[in-house]
């Protein structure tokens, strides 16, 4: 990352969560009429009236009338496009200039004797709609009234022309597949109120039908296109080709399906074809397909464009696409899309002619095994919350947004459920105004969805949930403080009990606290068991195993914080009922354990109990004289002995010697600073030692100081595959070289390499691009053992 971007991000981060409240006179409005400036209204203007009347009445019980006639009395909201004339002599004295860009608007509030007049004026019908959305976010809501600062005046325009989210009605989703058309309408409306102008569906998919579908996928996708038409939003489709394009029959069926979708869709503005993820066809086959798709698309939707991502294309394939675009300048192409496993945005923007736009496809939905994993996430959260848990991370995703801002013309996010709702709103608001403060964004979110009584505290609570995931879980005492805050909010605001966004925050606060308590408790149990195992030659092997198991099983027989556990189960049920969130495969028919099934992992051991149980079965089959030795080895697994050190390299709680690279605040994209990885074995229920599922490809370095320069040291490593280890920049030769999971490698360190008691371990890189990432080499644990 260049210095300009780094400085920009740092300056931005300094302002995060900073909020300055200005004291302003507020108008309390208990009657409202909406007046239109045009006799014939566009879809955007009709939608503006609809969202104002319905959302105000929903929150307050106050009904707004609407007409084209300016009333003689009462409070008024004027909605008009620039150039529309109103039959009124009222003039605003505090109007800011309207920015003459698409979707721009201005809002002003003035008092006229005993009434308040609010103006929403847009450069176009979308500007009117987004102005209405902004006003709804600015209102404070009370019973039968709304309030607004009397001197309010603003004028604004969007930074990015593309601002949207993918909402796929498919089995893979953790909630969308359970929705009715009315729920899609409401959620799309809410995204639009915060500035989204695009919605992307997934009408072609190769997976089983969801048990939650209320209507057929074709019918739902048709309805989503109609909803976009009603709100005057762009409608996009994500249409991967999960087939071999050399197969003419399959190719023709794909094109036939695509034409059917084009025919039934009320509108289509963009068609996004991913080069890969999923799909595995070279661009030489993809581009001719896109040319045919463009002909079909233009027949039904003449103003629509095709978009292509280079996901999973290698360097030569990407260059093929760049060259094709430069030479052919296809008129059917809207631009390229940058997503997971794509070339960097900077490269693609530089290679793409300026007439074509570059759209980002950010993954806002996943926590691990993704493009933007939670930085140095404590493994206790990985093993329980997993890949698709509720994940408000406004600060982190704001930093990512700012790192990409200069390259992109907008975004439509990847999302597979409502669990990433805060992240969606964050990116939407930043794409409207890159300088928007995170504190203000979370306050608007809280005010609109929870109400003015909790605006400040709930906004703080959302930011606190993000802080819960920072650093070692045991040392993060703020997790308990976050729980106390949300428990207080829940107690004092029972009226929000059925609000699904509220329920999500409560679930995360309770789940985080429960995981922390379990981790501390179960870690202590394992430490007690290890003491007994380390003394197996004194205690006796059978007795040591029996005593260790009794201690370890207290996690089940004497559960910690059972009330918290029951609360989590209760909130999971509430979320299934309120919004269809599927937190369990067995109970709620989630499509898979990796898809947000957090309830299924509520009791997953956070110590090595399962591994120890299996090891005891193995050890009991050994000759009696070998059993005690094997148990001692297990009991001392993480004990490097006097003068030694142990690190589980990807575990933030057990990696004090591991160099962590630059903070996400400086380098949010984590390019070249690959963080920890978490292997997904046996659908999350692997009984292997936990440290073997926590890895780094190659740690940036493992650094030791204060060593005995006269002593002989040995480096011990577990991991998988190869290990090209260097000590103080000199390659070490192994004396033991186990390549399997959990197998030991050992490297003697020549005394001459330890200078001034310092030792830095690093790894030479190894090109394994020909292997699936699951088969690539990696490091799990590193010991530095002082040979006595």
Question: Regions from the language model: what does each represent?
Answer:
Residues 42, 48-51, 55-57, 95-251, ...:
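Feature activates predominantly on carbohydrate-active enzymes
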Residues 691-710, 718-787:
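Beta-strand-rich ligand-recognition modules
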Residues 36-40, 78-84, 121-123, 169, ...:
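Structural motif
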Residues 4-6, 11-15, 21-113, 145-153:
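Acidic, contiguous N-terminal accessory segments
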Residues 415-423, 435-637:
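C-terminal non-catalytic alpha-helical accessory regions
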Residues 142-144, 197, 209-225, 229-230, ...:
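Catalytic-core regions of glycoside hydrolase
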Residues 2-4, 48-49, 134, 179, ...:
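Composition- and surface-driven signal marking solvent-exposed, interaction-prone regions
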Residues 625-707, 772-788:
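Glycan-recognition and processing domains
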């Amino acid at each position: 990352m260049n210095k300009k971007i780094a400085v920009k991000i740092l300056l931005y981060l300094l302002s995060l969560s900073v909020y300055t409240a200005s004291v302003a006179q507020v108008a309390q409005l208990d009657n409202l009429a909406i007046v239109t400036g045009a006799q014939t209204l566009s879809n955007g203007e009709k939608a503006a009236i609809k969202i104002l009347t319905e959302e105000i009445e929903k929150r307050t019980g106050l009904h707004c009338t609407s007409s084209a006639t300016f009333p003689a009395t009462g409070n008024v909201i004027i909605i008009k496009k620039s150039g529309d004339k109103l039959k009124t002599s009222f003039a605003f004295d505090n109007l800011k200039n309207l920015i003459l860009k698409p979707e721009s608007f201005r809002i002003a509030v003035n008092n006229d004797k005993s009434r308040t007049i609010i103006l929403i004026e847009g450069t176009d019908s979308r500007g009117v709609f987004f102005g209405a959305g902004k006003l709804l976010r600015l209102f404070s809501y009370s019973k039968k009234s709304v309030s607004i600062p009397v001197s309010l005046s603003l004028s604004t325009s969007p930074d990015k022309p593309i601002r949207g989210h993918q909402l796929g009605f498919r089995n893979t989703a953790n909630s969308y597949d359970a929705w009715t058309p009315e729920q899609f309408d409401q959620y799309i409306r809410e995204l639009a109120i915060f500035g989204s102008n695009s919605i992307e569906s997934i009408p072609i998919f190769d997976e089983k039908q969801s048990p939650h579908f209320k209507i057929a996928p074709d019918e739902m996708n048709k309805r989503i296109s109609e909803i976009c038409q009603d709100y005057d939003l762009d409608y996009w489709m994500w249409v991967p080709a999960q087939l071999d394009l050399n197969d003419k029959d399959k190719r023709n069926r794909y094109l036939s399906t695509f034409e059917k979708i084009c025919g039934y869709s009320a509108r289509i503005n963009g068609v996004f074809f991913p080069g890969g993820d999923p799909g595995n066809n070279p661009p030489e086959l993809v581009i001719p397909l896109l040319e045919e798709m463009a002909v079909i698309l233009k027949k039904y939707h003449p103003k629509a464009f095709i978009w292509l991502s280079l996901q999973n294309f290698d360097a030569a394939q990407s260059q093929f696409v760049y060259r094709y675009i430069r030479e052919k300048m296809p008129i059917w192409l809207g631009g390229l899309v940058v997503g997971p496993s794509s070339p960097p945005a900077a490269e693609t923007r530089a290679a793409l002619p300026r007439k074509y736009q570059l759209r980002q496809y950010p993954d806002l939905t996943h926590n691990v095994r993704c493009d933007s994993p939670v930085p140095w996430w404590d493994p206790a959260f990985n093993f329980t919350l997993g890949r698709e848990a509720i994940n408000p991370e406004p600060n982190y995703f704001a930093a990512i947004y700012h790192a990409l801002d200069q390259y992109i013309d907008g975004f439509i996010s990847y999302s597979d459920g409502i669990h990433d709702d805060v992240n969606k709103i964050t990116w939407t608001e930043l794409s409207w105004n890159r300088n928007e403060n995170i504190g203000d964004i979370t306050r608007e979110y809280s005010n609109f969805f929870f109400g003015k009584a909790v605006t400040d505290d709930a906004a703080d609570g959302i930011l606190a949930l993000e802080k819960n995931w920072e650093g070692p879980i045991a040392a993060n005492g703020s997790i308990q403080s976050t729980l106390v805050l949300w428990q207080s909010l829940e107690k004092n605001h029972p009226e929000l009990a059925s609000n699904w966004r509220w329920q999500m925050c409560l679930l995360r606060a309770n789940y985080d606290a429960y995981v922390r308590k379990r981790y501390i408790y179960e870690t202590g149990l394992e430490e007690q068991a290890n003491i007994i195992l380390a003394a197996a030659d004194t205690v006796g092997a059978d007795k040591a195993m029996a005593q260790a198991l009794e201690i370890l099983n207290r996690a089940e027989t004497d559960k910690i914080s059972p009330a918290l556990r029951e609360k989590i189960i209760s909130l999971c049920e509430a979320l299934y009922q309120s919004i269809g969130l599927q937190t369990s495969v067995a109970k709620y028919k989630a499509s898979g354990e990796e898809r947000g099934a957090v309830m299924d992992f509520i009791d997953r051991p956070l110590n090595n109990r399962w591994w120890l149980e299996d090891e005891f079965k193995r050890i009991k089959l050994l000759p009696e004289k070998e059993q005690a030795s094997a148990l001692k080895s297990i009991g001392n697994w993480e004990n490097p002995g006097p003068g030694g050190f142990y690190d589980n390299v990807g575990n933030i709680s057990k990696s004090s010697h591991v160099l962590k690279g630059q903070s996400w605040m400086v380098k949010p994209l984590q390019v070249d600073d690959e963080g920890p990885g978490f292997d997904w074995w046996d659908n999350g229920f692997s009984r292997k030692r936990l440290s073997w599922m926590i890895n780094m490809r190659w740690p940036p370095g493992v650094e030791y100081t204060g060593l005995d320069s006269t002593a002989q040291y040995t480096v011990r490593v577990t991991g998988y595959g190869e290990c090209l280890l260097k000590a103080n920049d000199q390659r070490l030769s192994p004396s033991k070289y186990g390549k399997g999971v959990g197998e030991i490698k050992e490297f003697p360190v020549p005394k001459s390499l330890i200078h001034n008691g310092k030792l830095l371990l690093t790894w030479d890189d190894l090109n394994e691009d020909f292997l699936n990432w699951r088969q690539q080499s990696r490091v799990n644990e590193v010991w530095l053992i002082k040979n006595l």
